[in-house]
Amino acid sequence: VNSFRLSVLFRKCASPSLSPLQIEQKVCQEIFLGKIASEESLANLIVLKGGIVLDGLSKGQRGHTQDIDFDFKRWRLSDNGLTRFIQKLNLAPAYPGISLAISAIRDLRQRNYKGKELTLAFSDSHDSFTLKIDIGVYRSLSGLVSYQMTPSEIPSCPLWRIGNEQMLVEKLSSFVVHGSHNTRVKDLFDAAWIIMNLKISHQQFRSAFGRILKEFGIFEPSEKIAKRLVLLLGQKEFIQNFVLLYKGWEPYGPLESAEIVSAFLKVAFHL
């Protein structure tokens, strides 16, 4: 049981590239996903998305992600529903002696998204760490992919994550919505990594692209939007802003990432 103390897990996750706060977040992520994966009924409740999936798929190459994003497949997103979900999580067999409690709940409202941000406290008898979790509700159960966590000493069930095509569209949607004002630098690097490292069906990508943009209230033809996106990524002044924010550990630099995404869009939409 001592091996499941927060302080022991902190030392296990420690890395020169991570700050103490980032190590705590990584420990909490490991505990949260471990508890979910240790109980099949829990594993079937959620669909993982965002940076935590890319961090796992890239075996840490993507860099640190500070939270966890997921959608409920079938669970109420009310405050009462969230409390019951955390209670259920505390009954999971993984990480005995470490309990989770909700410190705060905040509504998340964006252009095409309504969800909740939970601040969770992870505690044992000696220490307490904090992690933020963003939760939405998954609209379609098609295109899900089984996701096996990295091997650990704890037996685990496969989790579910969004498909590669939807993941890529979500990374590109910030550029479609915000255009040259987009400041989500990491989305460009993530999109390039997905294209270069994961299998993408052009047909499924086009379908997901049109569907998700409609959720944003954008009803123009997908080809027209894709062409505009290619033009945006070809603007040197726009990409230059990304160069200034480039941290150096992403697998592809800003210019190369923009070229990778543009080339993919041209092929996918026959531009």
Question: What is each of the regions a protein language model found here?
Answer:
Residues 1-46, 56-271:
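Structured mid-to-C-terminal alpha-helical surface segments
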Residues 48-52:
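Glycine-rich beta-strand-to-loop/alpha-helix junction loops that act as flexible
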